[in-house]
């Protein structure tokens, strides 16, 4: 999962969250570190690959 999304998403936030929460949770403004920019589009892109993270 991390290799697959790491190059696609900036900062690998989605890949890290995917592995940490096993695809059960998507990063949002509340769950992302304050030093990294967050947006609803980032969250929706992360959620679209959720099924890949459950493997």
Curated annotation (Swiss-Prot):
Cell compartments where the protein resides: Secreted
GO cellular component, one term: extracellular region
InterPro entries with a match to the protein in the record: Eclosion (IPR006825)
Main location: secreted
Alphabetical keyword list: Hormone, Neuropeptide, Secreted
Coiled coil: none
Alphabetical GO biological process terms: ecdysis, chitin-based cuticle; neuropeptide signaling pathway
The keyword Cytoplasm appears for this protein: no
Gene Ontology MF terms: ecdysis-triggering hormone activity
Keyword set includes Chaperone: no
Similarity comment: family membership: Belongs to the insect eclosion hormone family.
Biological function: Neuropeptide that triggers the performance of ecdysis behaviors at the end of a molt. It triggers adult behavior patterns: larval, pupal and adult ecdysis, and plasticization during the molt.
Protein name, as recorded: Eclosion hormone
Organism: Romalea microptera
Lineage: Eukaryota, Metazoa, Ecdysozoa, Arthropoda, Hexapoda
